[in-house]
């Protein structure tokens, strides 16, 4: 079993399937039957077992088996009758409040907080038994892992719903009970639905595209102090008329900089005097790229 290749293929296929929506876009969910689960704010890791050898890794083969050995041992025991399997799960920190991504990072780095870590499994990547539909996978996971979140490892609870019920569950789970979001899926599509948030950020630079006299994207940051700016991301989802207006303003503010940043199309950012603040709409802040490498 080629574990690394299987995980990368899975991540690529799942990433293409995911459709991110805000709660104002729930009507986009196509008609049909779905499985709904609460979205946990953690990190994606994979439990991999080949013959008698097992480990917990991510798509870059970073291995945390020794850090969360108790979770691995529990999974080894629960899956003792399974020879080859790869499970996808969300590593999260179980607390009285809503779990946070930062708590997961802290738990991996601080031994005293590690006891709070849990692996909530939500999918079967590969198994000895052919499991073609999510319904079959979920039954397998419930039977072998159970749904008790007090266990170190468990299957994330899913419920079957109609598309017309998504908004009702969003209000109950996310708005009322402060969950990060919802995952709504069937065998054709996976929707990630979250509350839309806004952030006021400095425009720190821009790139140019093939169209003259308009920007392609902007880089964004926040002041740490009077002399330092923290880069927090980039944005290219900008209306055409605003691209033209920003071009006129930003080229006048261009400055020389020792800091370099390359856009996804390979062009270098031009940096400017940090004088313009803009409001950005977003669904989430990410610390990692889709390949699990940290965003720098």
Task: Identify the role of each PLM range.
Residues 228-264, 269-274, 292:
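A short-motif feature that recognizes glycine-rich, charge-decorated loops
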Residues 43-50, 202-210, 214-225, 234:
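Catalytic nucleophile-His microenvironment captured as a short glycine-rich beta-strand/loop
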Residues 2-31, 36:
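Charged, flexible boundary elements
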Residues 26-149, 277-294:
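Covalent nucleotidyltransferase
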Residues 181-185, 265-289:
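Short, active-site-adjacent segments that bind or coordinate small-molecule cofactors and metal centers
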Residues 27-30, 37-41, 175-176, 195-198, ...:
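A short catalytic or substrate-binding loop motif that flags glycine-/basic-rich loops and adjacent residues
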Residues 193-202, 271-275:
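Short coil-to-beta-strand transition motifs
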Residues 1-10, 154-198, 245-252, 260-262:
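Amphipathic alpha-helical
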């Amino acid at each position: 079993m080629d574990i690394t290749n299987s995980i990368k293929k899975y991540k690529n296929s799942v990433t293409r399937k995911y459709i991110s929506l805000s709660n104002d876009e729930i009507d986009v969910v196509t008609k049909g039957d779905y499985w709904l689960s609460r979205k946990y704010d953690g990190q994606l890791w994979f439990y991999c077992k080949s013959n008698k050898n097992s480990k917990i890794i991510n798509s870059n083969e970073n291995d945390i088996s020794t850090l969360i050995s108790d979770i691995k041992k529990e999974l080894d025991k629960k899956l003792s009758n399974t020879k080859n399997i790869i499970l996808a799960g969300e590593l999260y920190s179980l607390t009285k409040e809503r779990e946070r991504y930062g708590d997961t990072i802290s738990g991996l780095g601080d031994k005293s907080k590690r006891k709070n870590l849990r692996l909530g499994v939500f999918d079967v990547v590969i198994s000895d038994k052919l499991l073609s539909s999510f319904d079959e996978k979920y039954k397998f996971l419930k039977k072998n892992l159970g749904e008790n979140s007090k266990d170190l490892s468990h299957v994330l609870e899913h419920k079957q719903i109609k598309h017309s019920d998504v908004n009702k569950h969003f209000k109950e789970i996310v708005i009322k009970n402060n969950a990060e979001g919802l995952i709504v899926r069937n065998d054709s599509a996976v929707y990630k639905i979250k509350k839309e948030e806004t952030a006021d950020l400095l425009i720190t630079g821009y790139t140019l595209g093939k169209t003259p006299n308009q920007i392609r994207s902007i880089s964004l940051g926040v002041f740490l102090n009077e002399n330092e700016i923290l880069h927090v991301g980039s944005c290219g989802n900008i209306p055409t008329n605003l691209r033209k207006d920003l071009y006129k303003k930003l080229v006048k503010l261009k400055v020389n900089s020792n800091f370099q940043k390359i856009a996804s199309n390979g062009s270098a950012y031009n940096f400017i005097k940090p004088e313009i603040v803009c409001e950005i709409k977003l669904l989430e802040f990410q610390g990692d790229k889709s390949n699990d490498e940290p965003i720098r």
